[in-house]
Amino acid sequence: MYLSRFLSIHALWVTVSSVMQPYPLVWGHYDLCKTQIYTEEGKVWDYMACQPESTDMTKYLKVKLDPPDITCGDPPETFCAMGNPYMCNNECDASTPELAHPPELMFDFEGRHPSTFWQSATWKEYPKPLQVNITLSWSKTIELTDNIVITFESGRPDQMILEKSLDYGRTWQPYQYYATDCLDAFHMDPKSVKDLSQHTVLEIICTEEYSTGYTTNSKIIHFEIKDRFAFFAGPRLRNMASLYGQLDTTKKLRDFFTVTDLRIRLLRPAVGEIFVDELHLARYFYAISDIKVRGRCKCNLHATVCVYDNSKLTCECEHNTTGPDCGKCKKNYQGRPWSPGSYLPIPKGTANTCIPSISSIGNCECFGHSNRCSYIDLLNTVICVSCKHNTRGQHCELCRLGYFRNASAQLDDENVCIECYCNPLGSIHDRCNGSGFCECKTGTTGPKCDECLPGNSWHYGCQPNVCDNELLHCQNGGTCHNNVRCLCPAAYTGILCEKLRCEEAGSCGSDSGQGAPPHGSPALLLLTTLLGTASPLVF
């Protein structure tokens, strides 16, 4: 019973989690513009596509209202609650902070009680239209990564248009129309994002989904970014490679999610009835408590950092690019036409770095050790060619094998690299470390591997001692010659002269011993001698 209850609770938790987290938290790993790799030429840079993290872009915008004096409170006025036209004791006064509703309250911290919001003047000049343009400007190209969400403190407007600009507000194009009656307001058939497809995802639609009359729980308007992404990446955005492929190859799709400015055009406030109640015009106004815009600086996949300085956003460009959006090659790096980075292949993409111009390579940043460079397309990098003065590496900044860095010389000094001079007999190879120490064979020591460790002697390299005057003594009168062999008397042989020569010939007991000493151990010989010289015993 307990097991089945646990499984039921677990299944419920999985279901709730999937509902609460419909999209992946991480969309792609493009957080590095370059990394170092090792090649035969030493360490070189490997470049990859990169982009800044998605963030709350409302922190960096400037807001402008048109007409400029449309905000309530100057002069002070009272307004009615829309749900109850007889509750007209709410006051807006721009000179009193507690009663003021300036535009910046659309972007402040949410969750306060009571809530903060911007509010327009009431529709006291009816039948003249009450219309407001709210322009959000970044002075920078940004890419939208999440839904645009507008939360109204009052009822949602009966008519509204969300517009975008790609040229800093010089021209505008509609993003989406909102109305209680699309056909009447904009001569368009009502649609929702669910009616679109991959082929019609760029269609500008009018929706009635968010423009119903005032209700307590119906204050939010969306512009659905993620639902449009889902046409390519799937309903849970798992197939990001498909979306990235479309963004790479379809400029119109990429531009659709790119803006420099947004404009909210409020054309008709929430009326709540068919006709406007001219006796209670103080109940008609616009009030917005929050606007959410999430995205990232557009850096054309050439930067991971976007700096906000002096009220301006700027990409910190990599890949030898420059410009506010990294949209051109740096001076002297026009070796091929500028190109944006590419998301593909997943997961690192393609950097499409700018390369040096042939006429501007100069000394190729080779510290004076070469005047030639070569571009390696596979690595998207430029390396020095034919490094002189025993140097090597991408910028001739390393020493060739068999040489080490002269710590007292600058990188551009001809004597920056010193030969290792490893002893060929004592070292494993001719290379040394950064301090000039060679790698020695067993029994060998010294910076150049030309000295022997104790117990070893030099003989075409260090060899273990065969004999010495300390532990490995030559026996039977033998003498040690240069620690490499014992010089034995004529009757003895062996490494330490420890064997009788006749033992090897097998003739120690024959008459032809030629004066060989009697066969036997030293103890037996001593006993025989003692017995031969002793006096006879008397009984």
Swiss-Prot record:
Q: Per the record, which residues fall in region NGL discriminant loop III?
A: 273-275
* Compartment(s): Cell membrane
Segment NGL discriminant loop I: which positions? Answer: 80-91
Renumbered to this chain, the signal peptide range is: 1-28
> NGL discriminant loop II: where is this region?
208-214
Positions with an attached lipid (GPI-anchor amidated serine) read: 510
Q: Which domain of life is it from?
A: Eukaryota
**How does the protein's chain sit in the membrane according to the entry?**
Lipid-anchor; GPI-anchor
Q: Which Pfam families match?
A: EGF_laminin, EGF_LMN_ATRN, Laminin_N
Where it mainly occurs, coarsely classed, is membrane
Q: Which CDD domains match?
A: EGF_CA, EGF_Lam
The protein's GO terms of the molecular function aspect are:
cell adhesion molecule binding; cell-cell adhesion mediator activity
Q: Which residues form the Laminin EGF-like domain?
A: 297-356, 364-419, 420-469
A single GO CC term, please? Schaffer collateral - CA1 synapse
Glycosites: 133, 320, 406, 433
Question: Could you state one GO biological process linked to this protein?
Answer: synaptic membrane adhesion
Annotated propeptide span(s): 511-539
Tissue spec: Highly expressed in the thalamus, with very low expression, if any, in other tissues.
Query: Which InterPro entries does UniProt cross-reference here?
Result: EGF-like_dom (IPR000742), Laminin/Netrin_ECM (IPR050440), Laminin_N (IPR008211), LE_dom (IPR002049), LMN_ATRN_NET-like_EGF (IPR056863)
* Subunit (UniProt): Interacts with NGL1.
Q: What is this protein called?
A: Netrin-G1
Gene behind the chain: NTNG1
